Amino acid sequence: MSFYLKLITVSLFFFFCQSCNESVKKSKKPNFIVFIADDISWDDFGCYGNKQVKTPNIDNLSSEGLIFNNMYLTTSSCSPSRNSIMTGRYPHNTGAPELHTEPPIDMVSMADVLKDHGYYTVSSGKFHMGEYARRGFNLIHDKKEVNGKGGEKKWLNVLENRPKQKPFFMWYASYDAHRDWDNSEFSGTHNPDQLIPPEYLVNDRQTRIDLAKYYDEINRFDYSVGEVVDELKRQGVFDNTIIMIMSDNGRPFPHSKTRVNDQGVKTPFILVYKNENILGITEGLVSSIDIAPTILDYAKIEISETFQGRSFRKLLTNPRKPFRNYVFAEHNWHDYEAHQRMVRDKNFMYIENNRNHIAQLGPLDAINSLSFESLYIKNISGELNEIQKEIFINPRPKEEFYEMQNDHFQRNNLIQNEAFENQINDLKKILNIWKVETGDSEPMKLTKHWYSRKPGSKVKNDLNKSIELLKTKHHGIRGEFPGQINNAVKINHKGPF
């Protein structure tokens, strides 16, 4: 064989092999890892502009993926939010719109569907979703003594011992950064004296200590994410793994967790998929109910009608393209009686407060915090500014309306501004359509306060003992759920998009 014939033969061989590799890469089902943090706000990662918190691994990873600037949760409450993500349904459509409630056992989850289609599915860390969700996992690590203080202890072990012939779906759910804070090797990572609290908190020593401990737990979450990414690369599966990093609700401080504004329901969301080299930043409006359909879309699985969200896969190929016209959120009972609804479009946010006679102090863990104590004391002495004392207003406005381009933290309520009358009416109309189409309701007898909201009945640095002291006569008694009268758990309508 001549030299040139050999050269041509070898070249064709390598071309054929390369083509085969590309074909296999494109046809092979992707793996999925969802890192879901506990109580971390959208702007508490470095890659979202926070220069005080230390998140080097997440920041580095974000440079290899797509940062979502407008990913909205459907609620700012732990179990309702997680169930909403897992089912792709609004909280009142899951049958579990309140904290510590569970969807019916026959509810369909994305883990369920993935498992049925050959995926190896694991939940490791905080579970908090209910029995229906257990059906969807081959393996569950949900015991604190096994998972470690941050809930991340088994993450590497799960990856190392997975069946290598199967694609996988990992639901890696950290306890970080939920109160109470604990002591670990990450404690002291952030110096309180070098921190400046958000403008709605008091800038005093004990608030800075509170914030530093919160940031320390975020740093632990970041470290664990980095460990998993390194292991994916070691195994050679990083490129074919779609990684999502997010939180279930806002930070556990006053003005944040349980709110339906950006500090409560806007989540950090980073998606990395090296096989498609998705890079950049998207401003598109996306809802957390869209996550499950997107995962199923990438897995080439038909998306059933029970999923109210829609796949945002097309947004990934063109991040500048708009996705949703509207996102919706709801706040129902979380320690205290509540009923709020929110809708936002590209430019405006409208909030409906249906229990506006109740001051919006925050959840129980926030009320028992050092940060709240400072706010409470300085409110009595009249030392708070307008933003800080907002949580004590009673009654609150029945309605709120914000211009989002110039009011990123929703400080200037424009509901009485006649210049925005048309925009206000438009969003009110859309919200009402959403309520009707998805079967939402406002029950007369909602679940009432399970705990007192008066500081002073607490045991410092012991939330569990404080809870016992703060229980009311209504503790343990549930009222009617939003959507219950309309059997919303059986309604699959997606609502306005």
What are these regions (language model features)?
Residues P443-S457:
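Short, charged, surface-exposed hinge/linker loops at domain edges
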Residues S2-F14, C20-I393, P397-E400, H408-K429, ...:
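Formylglycine-dependent sulfatase
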